[in-house]
């Protein structure tokens, strides 16, 4: 194995010196880079962790995650609820769950509005999201700003490929909340929201945007994702080798051995702690607090006001101040832990 590792390292240049664009592998270093002329195009890669403060569970947390709370649906295993083969035979569990998680019942979080600020300041190249809650759209991102890698509730289609009739979000919502399994008006087969189930291909837009975006990205900001689901997880390796990557998450993730990653076709993983680390920064903690800390360092004082204003608008439109109370601006932890879990060994080794 060591022989192969050395051979591939030399052949693929895995051990060669890379250009370092961050003067410090901390959130402060990322901030200074974002304020420089070198950083003009930012891609955000986001997962369920950016929506948990809105009251939407993530998938894999041991006690609070979605997979840990599906016993009432009597599934053969938790992931079956999102498998297309199981859905076609037993759609009822999915639609029961969909009623609980349906878009429109939750407000965007601080993370969502931070991404909107990136757009307003001309920095956002694209937001790639694994989420199907549509909160990026509610926060103000346009379809062209987004790659909804795992699909969306905005449209639905008949699962009968010879039919394929399209249905609107309002049509699907009416069916779900009437507790009726949505059936095609044309052929009576089940109608499924256009979210990507296990066993289905990702939308073509995912691959077309991936080809055009990552060759020119200046910074990756990765938030609230375990980076365990392919091919989304492989996006971290699509950026140029010099491009800095900031992870805002509860734990470090995406750390794949470069040699094994290349052998498996996943690309090089993230490196936060080794002596060769040169572009990856991890901020560990609540995603909203991480965005607040970064916004503070950037001088973007308007973030919290934006969240309050937009939440008030949503409440006014819904006619209820009680809707989604968990999504209000979370209390700031003082001071913002701007350096928390950024590569702390840096000064010891230099």
From Swiss-Prot:
Impact reported for residue 150 to A: Reduced deacetylase activity on alpha-tubulin and stimulates oligodendrocyte precursor (OLP) differentiation
Binding-site residues, Zn(2+): 158, 163, 184, 187
GO BP annotations, alphabetical order: autophagy; cell division; cellular response to caloric restriction; cellular response to epinephrine stimulus; cellular response to hypoxia; cellular response to oxidative stress; chromatin organization; epigenetic regulation of gene expression
Cofactor(s) needed by this chain: Zn(2+)
UniProt note on tissues of expression: Expressed in the cerebellum, cerebral cortex and cervival spinal cord. Expressed in Purkinje cells, oligodendrocytes and Schwann cells (at protein level). Expressed in the central nervous system (CNS).
GO cellular component terms, A-Z: centriole; centrosome; chromosome; cytoplasm; cytosol; glial cell projection; glutamatergic synapse; growth cone
UniProt KW Repressor keyword: no
Record: active site: 150
Segments of this protein annotated with the region Disordered: 312-350
Cofactor note text: Binds 1 zinc ion per subunit.
Family annotation (PROSITE patterns): SIRTUIN
Single GO term (MF): zinc ion binding
InterPro entries: DHS-like_NAD/FAD-binding_dom, NAD-dep_sirtuin_deacylases, Sirtuin, Sirtuin_cat_small_dom_sf, Sirtuin_class_I, Ssirtuin_cat_dom
Pfam families recorded: SIR2
Motif (Nuclear export signal): 4-14
Residue spans of biased composition, Basic and acidic residues class: 340-350
Residue ranges, compositional bias (Polar residues): 315-331
EC number: 2.3.1.286, 2.3.1.-
Domain (Deacetylase sirtuin-type): residue spans on this chain: 20-301
Positions annotated to bind NAD(+): 48-52, 58-60, 130-133, 225-226, 249-251, 287
Catalytic reaction equation(s): N(6)-acetyl-L-lysyl-[protein] + NAD(+) + H2O = 2''-O-acetyl-ADP-D-ribose + nicotinamide + L-lysyl-[protein]; N(6)-tetradecanoyl-L-lysyl-[protein] + NAD(+) + H2O = 2''-O-tetradecanoyl-ADP-D-ribose + nicotinamide + L-lysyl-[protein]; N(6)-hexadecanoyl-L-lysyl-[protein] + NAD(+) + H2O = 2''-O-hexadecanoyl-ADP-D-ribose + nicotinamide + L-lysyl-[protein]
Miscellaneous field: Has some ability to deacetylate histones in vitro, but seeing its subcellular location, this is unlikely in vivo.
Function text: NAD-dependent protein deacetylase, which deacetylates internal lysines on histone and alpha-tubulin as well as many other proteins such as key transcription factors. Participates in the modulation of multiple and diverse biological processes such as cell cycle control, genomic integrity, microtubule dynamics, cell differentiation, metabolic networks, and autophagy. Plays a major role in the control of cell cycle progression and genomic stability.
Subunit (UniProt): Interacts with CDC20, FOXO3 and FZR1. Associates with microtubules in primary cortical mature neurons. Homotrimer. Interacts (via both phosphorylated, unphosphorylated, active or inactive forms) with HDAC6; the interaction is necessary for the complex to interact with alpha-tubulin, suggesting that these proteins belong to a large complex that deacetylates the cytoskeleton. Interacts with FOXO1; the interaction is disrupted upon serum-starvation or oxidative stress, leading to increased level of acetylated FOXO1 and induction of autophagy.
Protein name: NAD-dependent protein deacetylase sirtuin-2
Species of provenance: Rattus norvegicus
